Swiss-Prot record:
Transmembrane segments: none annotated. This is Cell division topological specificity factor. InterPro entries: MinE, MinE_sf. Disulfide bonds: none annotated. The keyword Nucleus does not apply.
């Protein structure tokens, strides 16, 4: 065994860098896709609630959060008094 061959790299750095970049891009795309889903869910949930109860969009508080691999969508809606009274 040649001593110089022992310390040489078997792979060039370009393929390794390409693999790392592909992993980074895939991760970024996955994160951005999830936030788009949360925005769509927010709009659809508000549309369904507005279909059944008259709500003021200015009295709606929406929080989008992310903790590790979990995304959260928190919606606080101030309901009008008439909607809270049972008929």
């Amino acid at each position: 065994m040649n001593l110089f061959n022992f310390f040489t790299r078997s792979r060039s750095t370009a393929p390794v860098a390409r693999e790392r970049l592909q992993l980074l891009l895939a991760h970024e795309r996955a994160l951005s896709g999830q936030s788009d889903l949360a925005v769509v869910l927010q709009e659809e949930i508000l549309a369904v609630i507005a279909k059944h109860v008259s709500i003021d969009r200015e009295k709606v508080n929406v929080k989008l959060g992310r903790d590790g691999t979990v995304s959260t969508l928190e919606i606080d809606i101030e309901m009008p008094e008439a909607a809270l009274v049972k008929n």
